[in-house]
Amino acid sequence: MVKLRLKRYGRKKQPSYRIVVMDSRNKRDGKAIEELGFYNPINNETRVNISKILQRLSQGAQATKTVKNILNKAQIVAEKNN
C-alpha cells in the first residue's frame, strides 16, 4: 500500500521531516517514491506541493494520521479518511 508519510532528517534533537510517498512496508527513512514537501516542527514551518499531494490522494495513496494533521493545518483537505 502506498502512503504519504514523514521521513526524518536533520541533526540529533533537531528533527525535520520530508513529506514523501512510499510503500508502507519500507523503513521510515528508506527509499521514497517521491518527495512532496517538508515539515519542521521546531520552526513550525511547512512547505508542500499541493497539486502533487492531491494527485497522489486521487490515485489511492493514503495519508498517515500525522500527515493528515499537517495537511489540515496547511488548509489542504485530505480527501481520504482511511
UniProtKB/Swiss-Prot annotation:
- Location in or out of the cell: Plastid, Chloroplast
Q: Which biological processes are named by the entry's GO terms?
A: mitochondrial translation
Provide the alphabetized UniProt keywords: Chloroplast, Plastid, Ribonucleoprotein, Ribosomal protein
Matching InterPro entries, A to Z?
A: Ribosomal_bS16, Ribosomal_bS16_CS, Ribosomal_bS16_dom_sf
This protein's GO CC annotations: chloroplast; mitochondrion; small ribosomal subunit
Give one GO molecular function term: structural constituent of ribosome
Record bears the keyword Glycoprotein: no
What the record says about family reads: Belongs to the bacterial ribosomal protein bS16 family.
Q: Which PANTHER family did the record assign? A: 30S RIBOSOMAL PROTEIN S16, SMALL RIBOSOMAL SUBUNIT PROTEIN BS16M
Protein name from the UniProt record? Small ribosomal subunit protein bS16c
